[in-house]
Design a protein with these regions (language model features):
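Transmembrane-helix signature of polytopic, membrane-embedded enzymes
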Residues: 3, 9, 104-128
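Membrane-embedded architecture of ER/inner-membrane glycosylation machinery
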Residues: 3, 166-174, 207, 287-522
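Extracytosolic helix-loop segments that constitute the early lumenal/periplasmic catalytic or substrate-binding loops
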Residues: 18, 33-58, 65-68, 72-79
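Transmembrane-lumen/periplasm boundary regions of multi-pass, lipid-linked membrane glycan transferases
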Residues: 34-44, 174-182, 187-296, 303-322, ...
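Short acidic/glycine- and proline-prone juxtamembrane loop motifs at membrane-interface regions
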Residues: 86, 93, 134-145, 184-185
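Transmembrane-helix motifs of polytopic, lipid-linked glycan transferases
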Residues: 87, 91-113, 151
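Specific aromatic-rich, kink-prone transmembrane helix
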Residues: 103, 144-162, 175, 329-332
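Membrane-interface transmembrane helices that cradle and orient dolichyl/undecaprenyl
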Residues: 109-114, 152-171, 179, 289, ...
């Protein structure tokens, strides 16, 4: 029954991931870049097989693991003379990313054997978190990387309880390869986290067949290591740029654009995206520390501390860099959520885990959730007034979240376990319904509203073929390049054709799209 429930939650995540998947254009970072690299892989433009390019130049930012899968989808869904649709670009990352929902529950099942409630709660938390659901459906590497990391940890946990040591060793090796072919530098903290947890509990001593497990790992590592060796063989010292100049070296040493807040960026992302489960985290950290000698305590603390220690000091901080933190956060918070539902039953079912700390405060969390739900419903009412006009687009989200959280908090206060289960269902359904509404609207890709739309400008560039076009007054935009099917770099002076949203004097206008014009200037 546990596996059926986990599979059902995984199916729900897949349905959620596909809602409105192709309705909005690709955003600049990093969807349009990923799409272009995938298209050039499909077209075979590299100097050798499996070597990625971007506008016919070597692409040295990431290995082509996900790009290659997107290229396969493009081959299956797109005519050779067509630009691939947004749906075909986002499909592979969306499907792969939603696998973290059942895998997270399975991981918890291994950390807390027999604790079905905590396993299901882990999957529920991963299903309902906005950052996990939203970043997973973008044509980016972060969601797929989270799934690979979950399966890597799961395979390592299986080695001391399974007779199929070589199989699980191979799975661990393959997931290491997968991470090498996604964001390769992130493999280091993910592997260190697992190694710390294994060393803390000396778990490798109980592996059933260490030679078979290690052989499986080596075989599984072959694809990832093989590609990097192939890359180095063809491109020489340029291949090191993937690790140093444009990989770990850049994010460790160079404070890129949008990194003004430094280490606060991942903390802000967690504070913004962790609702409604975020209030459980402080209690969970204390509880896990009290039981740091248990497998759950060791792994959840080691993984969160190691990943947090790797992410917080980065000089370049972008919102999606915090994405790996959501898996250990879910592993930490889920047993507390299960305890809120089952209370005395939880300590009997998992006798090695005592009641959590500060129970008197923890038991007041349902009222807090209920209050948040009422506040959201109040904001929905305010949206009908003259002062709440800006809230109108969020009215439906406020209603479903408010009802879900208010009802969930109220039922979780009940003395009856059945009503408390209904409370968790209400909280979860409120979040899932809100995510479904969000993904069915233009609101889910809010970065598109932060600057001008590229598609009319791209159509203007496509309709007027000729010599190279430059973009005046703005930095180069990968999404404009994608839809224009040509690279349009920033204008830095001199004669030539240029796009601008300002009047272009002493130029020959070749086309107009709204306030934008394409002109040939001398």
């Amino acid at each position: 029954a546990t596996w059926i429930a986990l599979a059902t939650l995984g199916l729900a995540a897949a349905v959620l991931a596909l809602i409105g998947l192709g309705d909005l254009p690709l955003r600049d970072f990093d969807e349009a870049t990923v799409a272009r690299v995938a298209l050039e892989l499909h077209q075979g433009l590299g100097e050798a097989p499996l070597l990625p390019t971007l506008w016919d130049k070597p692409y040295l930012n990431k290995a082509p693991g996900l790009h290659s899968l997107i290229a396969l989808v493009i081959r299956a869904t797109t005519q050779s003379d067509e630009l691939p649709s947004e749906w075909s670009i986002r499909l592979a990352p969306a499907v792969l990313s939603c696998l973290v929902v059942p895998l997270g529950g399975w991981l918890q099942w291994l950390l807390r054997p027999g604790d079905r409630s905590s396993a299901l709660a882990t999957s529920v938390i991963l299903l309902t978190l906005l950052p996990v659901a939203r970043h997973g459906r973008l044509a980016m590497l972060d969601g797929t990387q989270l799934t690979a990391m979950a399966l890597l940890w799961l395979a390592l946990l299986q080695l001391n309880r399974s007779r199929s040591s070589s199989l699980w060793g191979a799975v661990a090796g393959l997931m290491t390869s997968a991470m090498l072919l996604l964001k390769a530098p992130l493999l280091v903290p993910a592997a260190v986290a697992a190694g710390l947890a294994l060393a803390w509990g000396r778990e490798w001593k109980s592996w059933n067949n260490r030679p078979a497990a290690l052989l499986g790992m080596v075989l599984g590592l072959a694809p990832g290591v093989g590609w990097h060796l192939w890359h180095a063989h063809i491109r020489g010292s340029e291949a090191l740029w993937l690790w140093g100049g444009d990989g770990a070296g850049r994010v460790l040493l160079d404070a890129g654009e949008g990194s003004d807040l430094g280490w606060r960026v991942p903390l802000i992302e967690v504070l913004e995206g962790g609702w409604p489960w975020l209030p459980l985290l402080p209690f969970a950290l204390v509880w896990a520390w009290h039981w740091r000698q248990s497998r759950w305590g060791r792994w959840s603390l080691a993984c969160l501390i190691t990943l947090g220690g790797a992410i917080l000091p980065l000089r370049t901080q972008l919102p999606w860099y915090s994405h790996p933190l959501w898996l250990p956060i879910a592993l930490l918070c889920a047993p507390l959520l299960a305890w809120l539902v089952e209370r005395p039953l939880a300590s009997k079912r998992a006798p090695e885990s005592p009641n959590p700390p500060c129970r008197w405060l923890l038991l007041r969390l349902p009222m807090f959730w209920c209050g948040l739900g009422l506040l959201l419903l109040l904001l929905e009412l305010v949206s009908f007034s003259s002062i709440g006009g800006s809230l109108v687009p969020y009215r439906g989200l406020a209603v479903v979240l408010g009802l879900g959280w208010c009802g969930g908090g109220w039922w979780l206060r009940s003395a009856a376990p059945q009503r408390r289960r209904l409370g968790v269902i209400s909280l979860s359904c409120g979040n899932v319904a809100a995510l479904a509404l969000l993904f069915h609207s233009p609101l889910w890709l809010w970065e598109l509203n932060e600057t001008w739309p590229v598609q009319p400008v791209a159509a203007l560039a496509r309709a007027n073929p000729g010599s190279k076009i430059r973009l005046k007054g703005y930095d180069e935009r990968p999404s404009l390049n994608w839809y224009a099917e040509q690279r349009i770099e920033r204008f830095k002076g001199g004669p030539g054709r240029r796009l601008s949203d300002k009047p272009q004097k002493d130029c020959i206008t070749e086309g107009q799209a709204g306030r934008w014009s394409l002109a040939n200037c001398r």
